[in-house]
Amino acid sequence: MWGERTHHHKHEHHKHEQHAHFPSGSSKEPKFIADSYSSVDEVIGALREAGLESSNLILGIDFTKSNEWSGRHSFGRKSLHAISGTPNPYEQAISIIGRTLSPFDDDNLIPCFGFGDASTHDHSVFSFYQENRPCRGFEEVLERYRQIVPHLNLSGPTSFAPLIYAAMSVVESSNWQYHVLVIIADGQVTTTNSSDRRLSPQEQATIQAIVDASFYPLSIVMVGVGDGPWDAMQHFDDCIPDRAFDNFQFVNFTDIMSTRKDMSKKEAAFALAALMEIPTQYKATQGLRPSEYLFFFLCILY
């Protein structure tokens, strides 16, 4: 009915001493982006003005069990994956991100993965289509999402690691083109309940995956939908050791969309919050020399 499960194991590699080389003193340096826009179109213009030239989108959707109750306050007690005449939070986020990044996507092909259902749990992902076929544009993403949701058994626990490694494989197969992985999820990575706040296996795996991904031309944007809590994700960056560049950002979709503004301004605010760091990260990945990608890839192989 949809794509087969795909296992993406942790890449074993040596310690890396190389770091991103940032362009300096150049007219191509990312420019400051203001924080008030009235429409998604204005945000698109701001991203282009700030230096974003090309970006390919990868989407990852959370199908863990908590989606059934995480909309108690923010989505009228309905499942966050409820399909009806009113777009659910996942559909809203997909649409806004898709509309914002599509002008920068040359082929408009969007690889889409699901995770956290009863077939994948925290150890693999599934593609929306067989043989990992991408969707053509965000409109097909939404159409395919609506088709598969009724047939999924929500489960867990939550780990972003398999999804991040799947995105890294997409980057490899694209000849190392720059991509943005947008993870839309209703909850943070599964934590332990221990008083000494030890990291759970899912947190450890996700942190390692984010570090590994920083050696790829790949930005990761985590979009939080539903009631949360989000305290751990908001401080997640602090737990991540040195990376080739700062490649992870969390955005609270619910907080932004619950403000008292008209819808076009809320959509613009969300698009900006999710993507305002992308021009800087795009430039950082351009600074990573191809030889550094090759070195990292060889470390994975050997």
Which residues are covered by each model-predicted region?
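Acidic, low-complexity intrinsically disordered regions
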Residues: 1-302
